[in-house]
């Protein structure tokens, strides 16, 4: 389930299927599906894999090439294999790209500038 303003870069994989680790259960063809939930304003970097049963919280960023095996909380940057939280997104992050300031200030008027 994807919510609003989710950015998914190229070559990402979302897999909801799981199979048993036990070989006898696998021989019987047993398989289950678990949902994936991606919150609002999430950015998923290129080549990331999101596994079954995972929830990614609102406003989080998943770094390129990550394999998300467990749920990620809201408002964080998470990266790696397996994906782990590196840090919270801070107020400083809002000023990291000053060339967006003119656009963000006028966005509510519908006359944004880049």
Regions found by a protein language model. Name each.
Residues 1-54, 88-90, 94:
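Flexible, glycine/small-residue-enriched loop-and-beta-strand segment within the central core
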Residues 5-11, 59, 63-65, 75:
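Outer-envelope exported proteins of Gram-negative bacteria
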Residues 15-16, 63, 69-70, 86-88:
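Conserved acidic donor-binding loop of glycosyltransferase catalytic domains
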Residues 21, 81-114:
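Terminal amphipathic alpha-helical/low-complexity segments used for targeting or macromolecular assembly
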Residues 43, 61, 77-79:
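Short-chain dehydrogenase/reductase
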Residues 46-70:
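Beta-rich strand-turn-strand
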Residues 74-76, 84:
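Glycine-centered loop/turn positions within well-structured domains
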């Amino acid at each position: 389930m994807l919510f609003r303003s989710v950015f998914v870069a190229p070559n990402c994989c979302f897999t909801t299927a799981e199979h048993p680790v036990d070989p006898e259960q696998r021989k019987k063809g047993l398989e289950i599906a678990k949902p994936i939930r991606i919150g609002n304003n999430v950015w998923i970097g290129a080549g990331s894999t999101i596994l079954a049963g995972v929830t990614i919280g609102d406003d989080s960023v998943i770094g390129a090439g990550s394999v998300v095996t467990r749920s990620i909380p809201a408002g964080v940057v998470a990266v790696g294999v397996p994906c782990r939280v590196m840090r919270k997104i801070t107020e400083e992050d809002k000023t990291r790209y000053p060339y967006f300031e003119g656009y963000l200030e006028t966005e509510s008027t519908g006359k944004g500038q880049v």
